[in-house]
């Protein structure tokens, strides 16, 4: 019963203290706090010190002061616990021992000054209670009038909790001693001497929050990270060492390879059997031998340009084989030692020479057999062919006069761009319209028009020079394909719009009208011809034809429209042409007097003698665009000139056949002045001049697109083009009228 009363009294006092210092109340807090206080107090002192302290307190205050001593002990225990909160587990014992020494030395007021146990008001109340307890202790300690706890009961109660608390404290200290906090241990003295600025509640929460983060795990994580870094450094070092070793091995291999290559190269220079040209020739020879074994049907399917390429390579190899004995003789005379040519090399040279001669003859025979299977009638040549470089090839064994470097450069276009379909002697083109293996770009005219070109056959001329290849195999060369595009004005006016070439006088051919082609036309033809020569090295060549037909066929090939070629012929007066001529340009200029904005369908209708494609259509449209550009430039020029002259009204502006503007336009579109300009064109020109005048007067020329409004007005003023312009011979009819 006394034990129960003492426990209840201590529990109530503890609750009061917790309320005073602001600690939140929880269930079972009083008993747990009391047990913790007693265990902490007695664990800090050895048994001897504990008994001496208790005896000293009992002797000093006597039996009447037991409650006061117990209160002070509890107060000190509470202060011990509050003071130990901020410190780690490894320093709890040292702190308790230090507090015990301070107590024995009479430094008890330090606990009150620390502010850890209670506030000033609480200490004052306890002093009053302690003073009154000397007179009537039961009234102060036990409000219910119950007796106090005896010394024996207190010792027994403390001994019960001492062992359990001591074991727990030792276990905590043992677990936390593995990772001591150096920073907190260095600041112990500062925390003891200086008053704490935080409350015990905040200190307690901070301590619990720190305990939730085990330092042992942090240290192990740091150790793991450092171990991984060290492992990566080691791996990097090993990889670097392996790379250096591999580089050393690579350098050694390169040195060995260079030594072997140098020795092999020196042997090749001495023997002359493994040069680069010979290796290439062996590959070409193997391909040629494979092609010889094929059947005639397989040969017909191949591109004839391949045979010529192989033949040219074989000829070059034959030249090398012929020069080998000379080099061998020079080597023997120079060395007379073990570096001379071996018997195997001689045998290889002889065998190679024989195989080359055999392969060359077989290739030539195969080409002749394939392209002479269908005899045809040769088309008569109207324009004399150009000259051919001498001695293109030499096949027979007796003639070994090969090209020098300068001769090869002179016939660059003919060698690089071979003519695989040169006509053979006594071999003529097929008279039917059936397509052969290689479709020519310019096909002969229909049989119904043979009589029209009969008189022109007398103008056919044989080539001035004949190559050894032609003399050996019976070839007759056709028109030489020049490696560069022919000038546009180099060919005569063989179009159906003009007269025959024989009727053109020197004056007509050299007149400014005949040379009046725009820069777009010339550049277009030049670009097409160059593109054709660079992208079609093995394309079929033309039969004997005029230079005009050659140039036009190049444009046709560039445009990519190679269908229905049987309808195209530059020799017929009624057949379609492949390109535009100067007469077409003159016709377009005359049509500009009637229409300024022709459509593509109109162009196809009035240029019915031209085989239309994408290039032809765009060129005609470009012509009319240039016509309009010149037309509008002149109109703006004379409109500004009229404004400068003081003209203020459009009524003063008029165009007659005597005015300067009309003469400028007529000189550009009708240079020969052999065509009568229609009156409608004068009206349109006058309207255009006035539109420019009004726009400039109104200040609209500030806008960059101010001419668009004028263009919309002029495009509606086009008139019908006369039907005579649909005729291919419209220029002759118009000029004769």
From Swiss-Prot:
Keywords: Biological rhythms, Developmental protein, DNA-binding, Homeobox, Isopeptide bond, Nucleus, Phosphoprotein, Repressor, Transcription, Transcription regulation, Ubl conjugation. This is Prospero homeobox protein 1. Residues 577-635 form the Prospero-type homeo domain. Interacts with RORA and RORG (via AF-2 motif). Residues 103-135, 464-476 have a biased composition (Polar residues). The modification Phosphoserine is found at residues 177, 179, 199, 291, 295, 511, 514, 557. Residues 103-149, 178-242, 320-344, 445-476 are annotated as: Disordered. One of its GO terms (cellular component) is cytosol. It comes from Homo sapiens (Human). Residues 227-242, 320-337 have a biased composition (Basic and acidic residues). Residues 636-735 form the Prospero domain. Transcription factor involved in developmental processes such as cell fate determination, gene transcriptional regulation and progenitor cell regulation in a number of organs. Plays a critical role in embryonic development and functions as a key regulatory protein in neurogenesis and the development of the heart, eye lens, liver, pancreas and the lymphatic system. Involved in the regulation of the circadian rhythm. The keyword Plastid does not apply. Most actively expressed in the developing lens. Detected also in embryonic brain, lung, liver and kidney. In adult, it is more abundant in heart and liver than in brain, skeletal muscle, kidney and pancreas.
């Amino acid at each position: 019963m006394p034990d129960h009363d003492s426990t209840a009294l201590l529990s109530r006092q503890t609750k009061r203290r917790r309320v005073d210092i602001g600690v939140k109340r929880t269930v079972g807090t009083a008993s747990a706090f009391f047990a913790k206080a007693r265990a902490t107090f007695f664990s800090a002192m050895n048994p001897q010190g504990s008994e001496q302290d208790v005896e000293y307190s009992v002797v000093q205050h006597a039996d009447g002061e037991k409650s006061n001593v117990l209160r002070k002990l509890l107060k000190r225990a509470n202060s011990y616990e509050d003071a130990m909160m901020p410190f780690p587990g490894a320093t709890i014992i040292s702190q308790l021992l230090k507090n015990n020494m301070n107590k024995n030395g009479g430094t008890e007021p330090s606990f009150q000054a620390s502010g850890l146990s209670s506030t000033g008001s609480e200490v004052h109340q306890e002093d009053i209670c302690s003073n009154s307890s000397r007179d009537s202790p039961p009234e102060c300690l036990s409000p219910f009038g119950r007796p106090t706890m005896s010394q024996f009961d207190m010792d027994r109660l403390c001994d019960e909790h001492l062992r359990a608390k001591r074991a727990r404290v030792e276990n905590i200290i043992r677990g936390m001693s593995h990772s001591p906090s150096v920073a907190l241990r260095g600041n112990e003295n500062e925390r003891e001497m200086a008053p704490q600025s935080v409350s015990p509640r905040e200190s307690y929460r901070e301590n619990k929050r720190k305990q939730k983060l085990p330092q042992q795990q942090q240290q192990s994580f740091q150790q793991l990270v450092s171990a991984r870094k060290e492992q990566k450094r080691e791996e990097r070092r090993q990889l670097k060492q392996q790379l250096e070793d591999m580089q050393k091995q690579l350098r050694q291999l390169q040195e060995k390879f260079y030594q072997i290559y140098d020795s092999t190269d020196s042997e090749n220079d001495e023997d002359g059997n493994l040069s680069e040209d010979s290796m290439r020739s062996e590959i070409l020879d193997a391909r040629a031998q494979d092609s010889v074994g094929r059947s005639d049907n397989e040969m017909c399917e191949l591109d004839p340009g391949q045979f010529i390429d192989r033949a040219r390579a074989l000829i070059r190899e034959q030249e090398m084989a012929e020069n080998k004995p000379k080099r061998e003789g020079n080597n023997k005379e120079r060395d007379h030692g073990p570096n001379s040519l071996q018997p195997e090399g001689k045998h290889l040279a002889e065998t190679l020479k024989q195989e080359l001669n055999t392969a060359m003859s077989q290739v030539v025979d195969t080409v002749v057999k394939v392209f002479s299977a269908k005899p045809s009638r040769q088309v008569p040549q109207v324009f004399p062919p150009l000259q051919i470089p001498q001695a293109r090839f030499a096949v027979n064994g007796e003639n070994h006069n090969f090209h020098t470097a300068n001769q090869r450069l002179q016939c660059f276009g003919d060698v690089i761009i071979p003519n695989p379909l040169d006509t053979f002697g006594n071999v003529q083109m097929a008279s039917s319209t059936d397509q052969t293996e290689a479709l020519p770009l310019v096909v002969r005219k229909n049989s119904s028009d043979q009589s029209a070109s009969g008189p022109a056959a007398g103008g056919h001329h044989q080539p001035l020079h004949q190559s050894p290849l032609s003399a050996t195999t019976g070839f007759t060369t056709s028109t030489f394909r020049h490696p560069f595009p022919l000038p546009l004005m180099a060919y005569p006016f063989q179009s159906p719009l003009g007269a025959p070439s024989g009727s053109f006088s020197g004056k007509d051919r050299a007149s400014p009208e005949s040379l009046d082609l725009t820069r777009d036309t010339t550049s277009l033809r030049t670009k097409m011809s160059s593109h054709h020569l660079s992208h079609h090295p093995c394309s079929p060549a033309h039969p004997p034809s005029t230079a005009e037909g050659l140039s036009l066929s190049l444009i046709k090939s560039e445009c990519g429209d190679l269908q229905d070629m049987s309808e195209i012929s530059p020799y017929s007066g009624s057949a379609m042409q492949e390109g535009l001529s100067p007469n077409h340009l003159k016709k377009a200029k005359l049509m500009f007097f009637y229409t300024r904005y022709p459509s593509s369908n109109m162009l196809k209708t009035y240029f019915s003698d031209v085989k239309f494609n994408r290039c032809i259509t765009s060129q005609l449209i470009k012509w009319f665009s240039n016509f309009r550009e010149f037309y509008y430039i002149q109109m703006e020029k004379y409109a500004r000139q009229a404004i400068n002259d003081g003209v203020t009204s459009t009524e003063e502006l008029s165009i007659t056949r005597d005015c300067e503007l009309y003469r400028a336009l007529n000189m550009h579109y009708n240079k020969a002045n052999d065509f009568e300009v229609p009156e409608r064109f004068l009206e349109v020109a006058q309207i255009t001049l006035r539109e420019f005048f009004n726009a400039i007067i109104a200040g609209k020329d500030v806008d960059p697109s101010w001419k668009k409004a004028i263009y919309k007005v002029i495009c509606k003023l086009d008139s019908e083009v006369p039907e005579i312009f649909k005729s291919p011979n419209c220029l002759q009819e118009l000029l004769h009228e």
